[in-house]
């Protein structure tokens, strides 16, 4: 009975190559569909896949056909409604077809095609969602680098554990050794066998010579057989070595206003932004620490669950969060050893006398030590004192950015704007 073992890299997913080719070919349409989809679903569900629809016209294959114009004579069998020179009315748009907007009137005629819909996996979804995004101004600090050791193949070695033995390379060495050790004997054996065959057919018979040749042939065959099939000299083992790969250390501070002026809709949008940010950081950078700070009149460092789901509320003093961040930086994150980033979300409401203090803390303590500080104001109202104070910071510091979010649909575009990967010219 014959057994076939499928060792293809794709395994059970036989169409992986075709799928990857399809994703590359229609990348623009897929990214557009993802941008629309993220505004229609909760960002807490972003860790799953997505059904993507592409207009049928965008995936149609090129084909040869007759050009418009010219004179043609066609015979349509079974026609009992029209005669020559009759005009046929165009089918009403949106009727019967699946490519319409779905907002028109029903119709009894007309044809069309639905959009092409397929499912992309969680990894494919996140790859497209966070493509071309990076932490701005990421630099490798020289004082202390966190070295990650990755295992790399480094040829073969003659010593190792049985689990790493290379069967193919060992058999190749065995064949080469046996060939080298027996090549001369095999040539001599072939010559003796040829001579024996010649003598055995000669007249008169040479019995003594035949006996001598048979004895030498037997001795040569015994010597060849004594050469071992495999020897410890032949064994080769796959060699692996760990190479240090320096990776930059980064910490992201997430500051969120949970004061009484933040209504539930505003808090939800802030939560969505930070959930998106958290997924981006945890997926793109494996060595990024995240510090969560919630604030109203008082600031507190919390864990991830409390940051998103705690019901605590109060007044509004933004400087309390900035002071706490400064304390945490001094205590745990030396700027010479860490790349420090911060993202702050608020509705813009703040005690009027506190806004100048926020400006002072940022200008003198935080912005000189952080790589990038982003401020997101979530409100439909007019900007207040905090926004105006921060505008002065944006004009002075290159590592400070601010954006305005009015609706849920603004979250993803603002997120991409804040963390767009810089080109070489921009970073220079």
UniProtKB/Swiss-Prot annotation:
InterPro entries xrefs: UPF0229
Region of interest called Disordered, as start-end residue ranges on this chain: 77-111
Basic and acidic residues composition bias: residue spans: 77-90
Domain of life assignment: Bacteria
Biased composition range(s): Gly residues: 93-103
Family as reported in the entry's similarity comment: Belongs to the UPF0229 family.
Protein name from the UniProt record: UPF0229 protein YeaH
